[in-house]
Amino acid sequence: MLIRFVLASLLAGLALSATAQDTPGALVEARTKAVVSTLAAQRAEFRADPAKLSAYVREQLETLFDREYSARLVLARHARSASEAQITAFADALTENLLRRYGDALLEVEGDLGVRIRAETPLRDGKMMRVNSEITRPGQPSVPIDYLFARSADGWRVFDVIVEGVSYVQTYRAQFDALLRTRTLDEVTRGLVEGTLSVDE
């Protein structure tokens, strides 16, 4: 369930890159309706052509999700001895593996999904920002989702999503730490690419 919400919230909240005046909270709030509307309007088309859905998801995630920085945090101490090429390969493989397994779950995102920004908290002298939000669904309890952003040369980019208190980075850090105690990073990356290795929800 975690990954379904992570992908849906990343895509729904972070669809387009921010302009200079956009704060992370404003970006999350402003873009949610537009992307949820697109998913709802093109649901039948995406179901009929999974490749089109995959291309759409990749395009949206690419604009604001800092997959390499996120991958470094997931790898933690294992990133210290890895080359830039190895980290990039791992980041790409992990993202593709998750999209391959859970991308279709985005088709379950309903058009009446909403978002409410509760707070923005600057971190590390303003270099990072935590956005506390809630995903709202009619007749159902709201789901707390926090986004962690880092400021880069390209603007604000998200590197972690925390759904109901469960962090994407911390969840996979624990799983990959266990794997990397017995395998090399290249072996783990290859397993993700080939589909012989999958991470749990």
Enumerate the language-model features and the residues they cover.
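Low-complexity, intrinsically disordered terminal/linker segments enriched in charged
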Residues: 160-201
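Surface-exposed, charged secondary-structure patches
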Residues: 92, 100-143, 195-201
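N-terminal signal peptide c-region/cleavage motif recognized by signal peptidases
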Residues: 15-17
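Early exported N-terminus immediately downstream of N-terminal targeting peptides
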Residues: 22-102
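Short beta-strand edge/turn micro-motifs at domain boundaries
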Residues: 142-170
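Bacterial N-terminal signal peptides that target proteins for export
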Residues: 1-7
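Solvent-exposed loop/turn segments at secondary-structure junctions
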Residues: 79, 96-97, 122-123, 137, ...
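Surface-exposed, polar/charged faces of alpha-helical domains
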Residues: 26, 41-52, 81-85, 111-112, ...
